[in-house]
UniProtKB/Swiss-Prot annotation:
Gene3D superfamilies: 1.10.238.220, EF-hand. The keyword Mitochondrion does not apply. One of its GO terms (biological process) is regulation of dephosphorylation. Keywords: Calcium, Cytoplasm, Metal-binding, Nucleus, Repeat. Possible role in the regulation of cell death. The lineage of its organism: Eukaryota, Metazoa, Chordata, Craniata, Vertebrata. This is Serine/threonine-protein phosphatase 2A regulatory subunit B'' subunit gamma. Ca(2+) binds at D281, D283, N285, M287, E292.
């Protein structure tokens, strides 16, 4: 059979016309464009249909079925994530494997492991451990070891920390009602309330005090992690800060007295803050007036500053509740922190311009001068103090000081103390004497 003749006959019957080279190139390009567009998900559709979905509406309060479905699906997801974590038995097995594959020579008492043995342990440890046995993790932990090894203890602590972070994230996510990766105030309150029975250092707290303790603990999280006062905190931010570590430190039954006193979440600290509030509340109505708050600390906060506190902060019939008082205490006890400086700066910014000028500084310092006269102290020139403040802060604009200037100067706490607290100003004025008598406790203004 003559195939050549048969094919020509077939093409003739089908009406085939031989195309030029240019036509063939155009056809090829057209086919390529169509196939490529189809493969990329394109086509003759509007661009809006190609935008991936990025908003998922949360079920409304009356959509009970959708809410239940969402809760159940999240619970199943979190349970699956929890099962993917190493349990105590698996962690113990990992430790045995690491100890078994130590890499000589032994230097001191520190057990080390090289990269070859590190990979061997990773293969034997199981599927759950694979994420820890990567070259990236090894290079992160490698010290100045002449043999290119890492510390077994350091690596194991790294694994333990990672597992703890994931466990804690899952635990916090259970209280994330919206499922959006953040906790509202009520969510965090529920978390801490259910955490109290697991913290031996809080065993002595009366149940009647639980609500005040929870309020005290939650305020620290929101004061520092929610500076814009949105009413919610990212779970990621909670894990990244040290507050949760401080809170869970209360699991230690042998926690020293010094550690408890310096820990905001400890029972002694919470009772101290609440006790101060009760002592200030002379009329026992559960709220603080400006006159009652004026006795806070050493009683040397200026009237002008206290006026600003009650103008700017949330009050009820001109009086301050416990939650607002906690923000006030956190700001004054942590004046070096940006969140505390932001709180105080807002009170100092009487013109609401986002900066402090000479007028603002003079407005507050006049109250300091008046208090000095009352205590029989020698008057101090505002010009001298103003020049010292600008020299300390070194603002970008020589005529005004912004919040960012205060934070970057690392002198924000000193500047704030000079302007709002007579005792703070006196401490600054006599700093050279205090340094000379470093071993002695500084006297109050009344002692001078």
């Amino acid at each position: 059979m003559d195939w050549k003749r048969s094919l020509k006959e077939k093409l003739r019957r089908d009406g085939y016309v031989r195309k030029s080279e240019q036509e063939m190139k155009e056809e090829e390009m057209s086919l390529f464009t169509n196939y490529y567009t189809e493969w990329k998900g394109g086509g003759k559709v509007s661009s809006a249909q190609n935008i991936p979905r990025f908003y998922y509406r949360l079920p409304a309060e009356d959509e009970v079925l959708q809410q239940k479905l969402r809760e159940e699906s999240r619970a199943v997801f979190l349970q699956r994530k929890s099962r993917e974590l190493l349990d105590n038995e698996e962690l113990q097995n990992l430790w045995f494997l690491l100890d078994k594959h130590q890499s000589p020579p032994l230097i001191g008492e520190e057990a080390m492991i090289n990269y070859t043995n590190f990979q061997t342990v990773g293969e034997k440890a199981g599927e759950k451990c694979k994420t820890f046995f990567t070259s990236k993790v090894f290079s992160k932990l490698i010290p100045n070891d002449p043999y290119g090894r890492i510390s077994i203890m350091q690596f194991f602590n790294y694994v333990m920390r990672k597992v703890w972070l994931h466990q804690t994230r899952i635990g916090l996510s259970l209280y994330d009602v919206a499922g959006q990766g953040y906790l509202r105030e009520s969510d965090l309150e529920n978390y801490i309330l259910e955490l109290i029975p697991t913290l031996p250092q809080l065993d002595g707290l009366e149940k009647s005090f639980y609500s005040f303790y929870v309020c005290t603990a939650v305020r620290k999280f929101f004061f520092f992690l929610d500076p814009l006062r949105t009413g919610k905190i990212k779970i990621q931010d909670i894990l990244a800060c040290s507050f949760l570590d401080d809170l869970l430190e209360l699991r230690d039954e042998d926690l020293s007295k010094e550690s408890q006193e310096s820990n905001w979440f400890s029972a002694p600290s919470a009772l101290r803050v609440y006790g101060q509030y009760l002592n200030l509340d002379k009329d026992h109505n559960g709220m603080l007036s400006k006159e009652e708050l004026s006795r806070y600390g050493t009683g040397t906060l200026t009237c002008v500053f206290l006026d600003r506190v009650f103008q700017e902060c949330l009050t009820y019939d001109g009086e301050m509740d416990y939650k607002t008082y906690l923000d006030f205490v956190l700001a004054l006890e942590n004046r070096k922190e940006p969140a505390a400086l932001q709180y105080i700066f807002k009170l100092l910014d009487i013109e609401n311009k986002g900066s402090l000028n000479v007028f603002s500084l003079n407005f507050f310092f006049r109250a300091i001068q008046e208090q000095m006269k009352i205590h029989g102290q020698e008057a101090v020139s505002f010009q001298d103090v103003k020049d010292e403040i600008f020299d300390m802060v070194k603002p970008k604009d020589p005529l005004r000081i912004t919040l960012q200037d205060l934070i970057q100067s690392s002198q924000g706490d000193t500047v704030c103390s000079i302007l709002i607290d007579l005792n703070g100003f006196w401490t600054y004025e006599n700093r050279e004497v205090l340094v000379a008598n470093d071993g002695e406790s500084p006297p109050d203004i009344d002692d001078t």
